[in-house]
Amino acid sequence: LEFAKRKWSVAIAEINDERAKETAEMVKKEGGKAITIHCDVTKPEDLENVLKKVVKEWKGVDILINNAGVAAAGWFEKIPLEKWDWIISLNTKSIIHGCRTFIKYFKESNSGGYIVNVASNAGIASLPEMVSYNATKAATISISETLKIELAKINVGVSVVCPTFFKTNLMDQFTSPDQRQVDLANTFFGNAKTTSEKVACHTIRSIEKNRFYVITQKDGRNMWRMKRWSPELYFKVMSAFYKTGFYDKHLVKLLKVMNLIG
C-alpha cells in the first residue's frame, strides 16, 4: 500500500485469489494501479507467468518483492522431514524461483531494477526451537548478500528485510509438533507493537537509500549488533537464558527492553 500512495502500479501475485483481490482494491483506493495474478511461488512456471503478465500490462518491472513465507517451530529432532521440505519449498525455493526469473529479465532488458527479499531477524538471531524457520531465513539473507554483489554491475539493487515480531498473518499457517511452542508464538505476535505498515514504510525508505540490511525494529538491531560485535558473548547469554527457562517466562519482556536500547 505504501507503493500505492506513491502512485505506483502494483502486481499482486498470490495463491489466495480472494486475498489478492482484497489487496488490489486497497491499492486502488490509495491511488495506485493494481492487477492480480494467481501464483504458487513453489512453481517456477508460475513466476514466469507473473513476469510475462506484468511486462505485457506495464511494459516493464522496476521492483520485485519476494514476500511469501510461512513460520514453524520445533526441537530439531522432532521436526518431521516432510515439514522441512514444506518450509524450505515456501521460504527458500520461492526466493530462488523469484530471483532467477526476474534477474534474467533485468539482465536482458538492461534497465536496472531492484530486488527486495523478505527474511527475518530469525535468520540472524537463531533463537532456539525455531531451527527450520531460522535456517530458511538465514538462507534468504545469504542469497541476498551474494546477489547484492553479483548484481551491482548491472545496476540492480538488493535489500533484505529482517523484522522481528510484528502484526501479521504469519500465524495462519504456523506449525509445530508442540502446543507450548504454538502458544509462545501466539504470545510473541500478540504482544507485538509494530504493524506491517511500519515495516513497509521502513522498507521503502531503505530502498530509496539503496540500503541493504533492513532491520526494522530496535530489538532486532540490538541482537544483530551484539552478535556481530561479540558472537561468543551472544551465544553465552542466549544459552544461559534458555537453560534457566528465561525464554518461556521473560522473552517478551527482554524484547521490550531491547527495543528501548539503541
Over which residues does each language-model region extend?
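The beta1-alpha1 cofactor-binding region of Rossmann-like NAD(H)/NADP(H)-dependent oxidoreductases
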Residues: 17-18, 38-49, 81
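Substrate-binding pocket helix/loop in short-chain dehydrogenase/reductase
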Residues: 75-76, 80-85
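SDR active-site lid
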Residues: 153-220
